Amino acid sequence: AMSNKSDKPNKSDEIIKIRSAKKMRDLMANYYLEAMTAKQNNKKVAWITSGGPVEPLVAMDIIPIYPENHGAMIGASKMGEDFCAKAEDMGYSMDLCSYARSDIGCAVVKGGPIGGLPEPDMLICCNNICGTVMKWYEIQARFFNVPLFILDTPICHTGYTPEIAEYVKTQLNEYISFLEKVTGNKFDYDRLIEVGKLSLEGQHLWQKVLSVTAHKPAPMSAFDAFFFLAFIVTLRGTK
């Protein structure tokens, strides 16, 4: 029997590229270029976990770098197997997170899709993202011989309490003192207010972007959302 279906592709099946993707790639390229040339420009580089408070770094003009993002880039470039094998040769179990193994191996080999990350002047680890990051960052702090700050965030099993707020506030003050000590500069609280406002505005706008996916058909996919997530993680608090 003959089919009544047309051989022409359905317009609704066409993949429409998001125009802002190119601009994002350009901005991210500039971000990595600035990080790679930080030492020449007398700037400090901090490796920070994706859930860590980046705003104090931005306020102090410290360039934040995200090894987790780098792990994703290594995986997307099909280079993870070699770096993971290097980490395993160093004694790290193949059961560990592949992002961690990729980053540990890459730091030794100094390769990868962008030629390795710029060496850190400090490491900032916040355990609200996962438990692996604490040991991962301890390993890298020893390898690069740089100071490490760990921010411990309690798990809110029964809700947010004043005790939790005070506990985290105390650590944030310690975090600021740590940054002052490493950089030798006084912290600019007025600048932090500006950065905080931009960060909050960015988070609200990102929520609006995500909310449009409730529309049918959705204007962007889950893969698009992961791709554009780089902005709200990496450049939060900037404009």
Features from the language model and the residues they span:
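A charged, amphipathic alpha-helical module
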Residues: 5-44, 169, 173-239
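Short, Asp-centered acidic motifs that coordinate Mg2+ and/or phosphate
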Residues: 44-45, 122
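Short alpha-helix boundary/capping motifs
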Residues: 46-47, 130
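An N-terminal, globular interaction/scaffold subdomain
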Residues: 47-116, 136-137
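Short, hydrophobic/amphipathic alpha-helical patches that form generic packing surfaces
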Residues: 54-59, 139, 226-235
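Internal, well-ordered alpha/beta segment that forms a basic, Gly-enriched binding/recognition surface
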Residues: 106-108, 114-208, 212
